[in-house]
């Protein structure tokens, strides 16, 4: 219901994405893995956001301008808790705890200089002990040749 994937349009002489694009994609993918590994009932939204946000910045990319993820329910942006930073515009939503049965997106992004934005958006179900991905994760860049 709310997924994003990263695609790269190859030039005629290319058979894969350039190293800078691949590196950005790998950082996004790893940031999702790290956040998901800590996403479980009782965690506050800002704690999960901070994991992905810090990892991306440590890898040398700029901070992304939005929260890591939002709840999904009857609407694309639904529910209470937000996987986001403690920014004024989000109010108390990042301070709320994640609950079993919630569904969240995990959608970090980064800008790859001279190429554009890389992002992946996954959806997860919060389980008793963690989270479960609701669709097959994107593990490689989709290429258009």
Predicted regions and their residues:
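Active-site neighborhoods and metal-handling regions in enzymes and metal-associated proteins
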Residues: 1-145
């Amino acid at each position: 219901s709310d997924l994003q994937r990263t695609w790269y349009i190859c030039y005629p002489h290319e058979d894969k994405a350039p190293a800078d694009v691949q590196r950005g994609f790998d950082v996004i993918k790893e940031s999702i893995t790290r956040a998901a590994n800590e996403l479980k009932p009782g965690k506050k939204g800002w704690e999960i956001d901070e994991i992905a946000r810090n990892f991306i910045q440590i890898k040398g990319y700029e901070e992304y301008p939005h929260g890591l993820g939002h709840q999904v329910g009857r609407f694309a942006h639904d529910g209470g808790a937000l996987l986001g930073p403690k920014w004024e515009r989000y109010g108390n939503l990042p301070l709320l705890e994640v609950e079993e049965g919630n569904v969240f997106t995990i959608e970090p992004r980064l800008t790859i200089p001279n190429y554009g934005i890389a992002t992946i958006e996954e959806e997860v179900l919060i389980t008793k002990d963690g989270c479960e991905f609701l669709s097959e994760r994107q593990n490689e860049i989709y290429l258009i040749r």
